[in-house]
């Protein structure tokens, strides 16, 4: 008969089991699956004209034929209309001896072109196939196009007629946030001539920053691309531009346009330049929280948010579209006025929900990680990071981002978030345009 009072294990054995369990838990935590994020490899060289080239590649792209090429420029100017018009003309029928747009010409070659601009950065992009039957003719066409584009008067006149009277919201907010407030704020359009467009495109060549290549290249493909880049950039010069002359408005203000019901609120705020990956993560979570929080307001239809993370004068802007009748909405018995959040509220760190609610923060961070696991597999996303988030002459380069973003994500805490927002946001610069109709 067994003795039920006898312990199953002796004390030394029990101590050993407990120690083993503790070590096992520690090892499991140590080896717990972290974010499934790839780390791109980076190779660098310079063109024959001295322009830096950065090539990003990763194992996940070995079977992909997608290649991204980005020509990044640093032409600092307050004349945003001139930048917009020049790049729009470039994307039109600017290929010499052609009446088709550049994308119409590139489409049969499984390629496309695009552009990006802000008050400090400009980018001309090509998405192309690395297959030789497409690659060679695409690069030949791109070389002819970018070396000496032909800006046609008829196309210029048509574009001016269509766009001059309705400048983008981005331009309007930049004028309010950054430019001389003594100017007429109702005059957000700037007259641009075709000669100015041609001259500005030539000036871009003297403002080159970096050329980025993202995607898989065989040794033969790499040499073909290098030759094309050398040809395109043979008269490029490195930029020495500075945004020190551009100052953001340090006193918050609200501008009202038209009369009637409140239709839109357009907001802008200056930011401190992003100098670390955790600061970039913080802005992404803050932005997601801002959009989600405002979208939950009964009187708001939808919210759009965008970041311009330029190297010296970054900023954020968002556009709120209100319900058809905001007055009726806020006067309904079901409307909870105590939960009203204004367009300006979330520029103050202490009023950001995810700063004060750990659960809300964790949810936003988890959602961000899931999105990132998909985005980081895309060469296009890495092209965006290279040209619009990191800066080769700034505090955060694409190489630093690629090497450190996984660890930054995995170790990111709410304390990191709170500290970063306190540093990044400049509430005193907040500018608001209320549009009535």
Residue ranges of predicted features:
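Charge-rich, well-structured scaffold segments of protease-associated domains
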Residues: 2-29, 104-240, 301-437
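His/Glu-rich zincin catalytic helix
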Residues: 2-105, 206-299, 432-437
């Amino acid at each position: 008969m067994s003795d039920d009072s006898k312990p199953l294990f002796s004390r030394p054995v029990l101590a050993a089991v407990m120690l083993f369990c503790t070590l096992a838990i520690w090892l499991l935590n140590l080896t717990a699956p972290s974010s499934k994020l790839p780390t791109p490899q980076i190779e660098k060289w310079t063109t024959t004209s001295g322009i830096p080239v950065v090539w990003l590649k990763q194992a996940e792209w070995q079977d992909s034929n997608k290649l991204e090429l980005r020509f990044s420029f640093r032409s600092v100017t307050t004349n945003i209309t001139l930048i917009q018009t020049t790049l729009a003309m470039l994307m039109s029928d600017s290929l010499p001896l052609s009446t088709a747009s550049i994308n119409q010409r590139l489409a049969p070659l499984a390629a496309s072109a695009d552009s990006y601009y802000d008050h400090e950065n400009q980018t001309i992009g090509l998405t192309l196939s690395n297959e030789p039957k497409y690659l060679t003719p695409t690069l030949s066409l791109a070389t002819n196009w970018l070396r000496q584009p032909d800006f046609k008067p008829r196309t210029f006149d048509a574009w001016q007629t269509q766009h001059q009277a309705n400048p983008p919201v981005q331009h309007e907010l930049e004028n309010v946030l950054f430019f001389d407030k003594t100017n007429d704020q109702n005059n957000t359009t700037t007259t641009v001539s075709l000669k100015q467009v041609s001259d500005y495109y030539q000036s871009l060549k003297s403002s080159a920053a970096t050329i980025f290549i993202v995607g898989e290249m065989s040794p033969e493909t790499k040499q073909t691309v290098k030759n094309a880049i050398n040809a395109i950039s043979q008269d490029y010069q490195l930029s020495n531009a500075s945004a020190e002359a551009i100052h953001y408005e340090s006193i918050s203000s609200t501008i009202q346009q038209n009369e009637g019901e409140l239709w839109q609120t357009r907001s802008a705020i200056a930011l401190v330049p992003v100098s670390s990956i955790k600061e970039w993560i913080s802005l992404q979570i803050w932005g997601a929280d801002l959009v989600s929080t405002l979208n939950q307001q009964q009187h708001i239809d939808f919210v759009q948010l965008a970041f311009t993370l330029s190297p010296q004068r970054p900023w954020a802007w968002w556009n709120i579209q209100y319900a058809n009748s905001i007055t009726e909405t806020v006067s309904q018995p079901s409307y909870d006025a105590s939960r009203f959040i204004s367009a300006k509220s979330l520029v103050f760190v202490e009023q950001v929900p995810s700063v004060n609610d750990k659960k809300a923060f964790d949810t936003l961070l988890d959602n961000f990680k899931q999105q990132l696991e998909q985005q980081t597999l895309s060469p296009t996303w890495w092209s965006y990071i290279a040209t619009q988030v990191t800066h080769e002459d700034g505090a955060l380069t694409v190489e630093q981002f690629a090497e450190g973003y996984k660890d930054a994500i995995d170790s990111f805490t709410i304390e990191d978030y709170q500290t970063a927002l306190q540093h990044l946001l400049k509430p005193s610069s907040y500018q608001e345009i209320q549009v009535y109709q």
